[in-house]
Amino acid sequence: MLSQYDEQLAAGDNNGFNKQGNATLYSFDFVDADDFLDSISGALPNNGHNNVNPNTNDISFEDMNIMNPNIYSPVSAASGDDFTQSSGQPMISEGSNYTGQNFTDYLSDNSLEGYDKNTSRPLHEVDIGFSNKRSNSTSTGSLSHNEEITPISHYSVDSIVTSPEPPINKQGDFPPIKRTTTVSSTNSITNTTKKPAKVTKPKSKDKNSHNMIEKKYRTNINTKILALRDAVPALRIAAGCDDVSIADLEGLTPASKLNKASVLTKATEYIKHLESKNFILKQQNIELHRLIQHANMNPKSLPPPPQQMQAPPQPGFGFYPPQNQSFNVTPASQYPSPQQQVSPTQQQTVHHPPQPNRYLLGGMAAVMGTSLFGGSGENDFRSLSALPFSYLFPNAILNPSPLTIQLWTLTKVLLVVGSLASIFIPMYKQAQLKKEDKPNTIPETSLLDWILISIGFKTPAKLSVSKRDAIISNLQGGNDWSQLVSDYFYLAGCEINFENCFLSLVLGTIIRHRFPVVATILNHYLSMKEALLLNLDYKGFSKSLIRLNQLISKVDGVSIFESTNLTTRLTNVFTNNRINANIVDGQNHVKYIEFYQRNINDYYAIVFNWRLLEFIHELNVTYLEQLNDDQSQVLTDLKIIEAFFGEQDNKLFGYYQLFTSILNANYAPYLFESLKDKVESSLEKFRIAYEGIDLTDHEIHNTSSEDEYEQESPVVYKYEPTLKSQKSLISSLNLVNEEEFIILTCSLTIYYYKNKEYDRALKLLNYLRLDNDSKTLSLLTFTSLITLINELIPGKIEDNVNLDSAIRICRDWLENPDLTQYMDEDIKLELKKIVVTKGMIVNGIDVNESDEE
């Protein structure tokens, strides 16, 4: 049976969805879905109404530690009763409270990741991405945790506009989930408890084989520990080696014991010591390279070599510390820091040779300069006739002509200019040498440089990695507007590529948002940058920039810089304000905080994820606007952005799954499998974080170097508690929030209702015990509720208390102006009509079809 969404999908993509008319729906176990909804029903705030067990009447959960689902990264303080196994032995001592690190820290622990990849049991493999028919491209939709695959790594134009097919029961692709028989397992456990335990002595052969494996395992570990001990000087001294002395420790203390803990501790200490020593040597090497480059650039100004001084002894094996120096001194104190190292050019005073005749030339220039103002040049020749040898001078000098007088005046002027030049030119050269001696710094592009680059009189500069990091660091909480404006002009004068244009547009958009006065001037330059950005390809290796480049060039265009909410959030991050301050859009704001914290070291990933969340929000509003109309455009847009929701990003893909399950209830089984796997994996990691990793006989055997396998004793597996028995723990850790629970329940109910399994749909609907407070509902949650009442009313299960509560909550939500101020009045009016009409039907009031429409 196809829903209205399947028909729209078929209309939108004939090649991919026309074959679904005769296909059966994806089949999965209803008992699993029922048990899972029962175990996560604590996600709703009114837990007193949620503890409903349809199968048994003697089970109640009165002491559930319900956390607020709207709090990000909750810390559980569950009591020891929440961790009790069926055997009656609590995992945590009774009466104690868990006060360890946050549960999110447990999930990010390296040891847990290693365990999850190697030793934990595999999760259920469910094809989440769904098979698509694509031309010239191949795509796989299986749920994968491979960190190296990105949604753009196999990107093509065809693959980006394909849509996931609704989940159908294809033989081989979607095998039905096996039904778990909880009754038989319960009976077997009951029988074992009634009969007395029979103690049997194991066979000697099996016991000997097991002991041999353990012995080889211990021998292998001890051998590696001994090899590690011989590699650390502090341990070799404690072991009594003769080739190592106290001086070889380089300031480290020798070990007092040789147990395994001491070996690992001293080995870690020695590794850190070597890293510190390596860092200091690198700094010295960099300083020497700098001095060599400076000497090659200025060979004439190189000062004489400094006086030879005794070099400090280099640490190493055979090095004895100076007198009165403790061995506990860290090796870093034995080396001068880069700030303390003074280059020879700074130690030597620059001595310039004296400038003889400088004052003499200055006096001559002054005398000749004053003679220029003494009258005409004839006075300089009149005194020549008084000389006793005046008869030797020609008549042209004694009685000069006007031309001779002019030539003499010009000669005096040139002599004065030459004298002044001989004074000031050496002073200028000396000032230039002082500038060259200063360390070279990267000059920042000023406003004048930007103007020169704009008119083509200067070549653009290249954006260095350090400058780029400084710009991004200022964007993430710098709160320095003057630096932000300076960075904008700097980027405007840099070479043109995708990253520079994107950063320049981000800076310009934030400035325009903060200072609307300059918007008129900035819009011209920003429009030019936007036109360039659309035609630029990113050729680097940053995955976030690759995805941003594909998103802008294929889907979003320059609309990303026109988003007011995105610009406001980026401005809030820059000014160290709350991320969602001054924003009311009906979204789950916790999602934005989660993605910011997960990508705090990648600014481009933050912008990318936030923009995808806005895509879902915009499609959500469009879906509500066309709730009873043709929704093919919404599904087409959802197909376009599908490729960007990579499965390696579980958070982002999970949010995409929630919205997809609302649009098409046939995706509800995949959402159920995804949430169930997440809960089971989180519970397993939580158990491992508390109990530690248990090594089985098989793991012990695999770690040994034995090549031949011997007969082993059968492995006895530990009892794994069911999800039902861990209901309180699930709610305490907030593994499933209120939004996920409501959407999953609504989607599964619609799924069974459209499959004409009304009893099962009604049974799942009973878990939807909603709170009367509508202020905590996000837009996505409201969409799932209004879709539920729109699909089930009128129908065979319309007479239900939970449906009546959903109608009341939807009506209150629409009448709250604080929650719907971003919506058009026409959309709100149409939604109110739908809710009122459904409420009248539930209350038994006859409604004509024309009125209902």
From Swiss-Prot:
Major localisation: nucleus
Keyword Transcription: yes
Upregulation: Up-regulated during the yeast-to-hypha transition and in virulent strains during intestinal colonization. Also induced upon exposure to fluconazole. Expression is down-regulated by tetrandrine and by Escherichia coli biofilm secretory products.
Signal peptide feature range: none
GO cellular-component term (any): nucleus
Pro residues composition bias: residue spans: 301-315
InterPro entries to which the protein is assigned, alphabetical: bHLH_dom, HLH_DNA-bd_sf, Regulatory_TF_Diverse
UniProt biased composition (Low complexity): 180-194, 330-352
GO biological process, one term: regulation of DNA-templated transcription
Region (Disordered): 165-209, 296-353
Knockout consequences: Impairs expression of hypha-specific transcripts and leads to a medium-specific impairment in hyphal development.
Keyword field contains Transcription: yes
One Pfam family hit: HLH
Keywords: DNA-binding, Nucleus, Transcription, Transcription regulation
PANTHER family: TRANSCRIPTION FACTOR HMS1-RELATED (PTHR47336:SF2)
UniProt protein name: Transcription factor CPH2
Annotated source species: Candida albicans (strain SC5314 / ATCC MYA-2876)
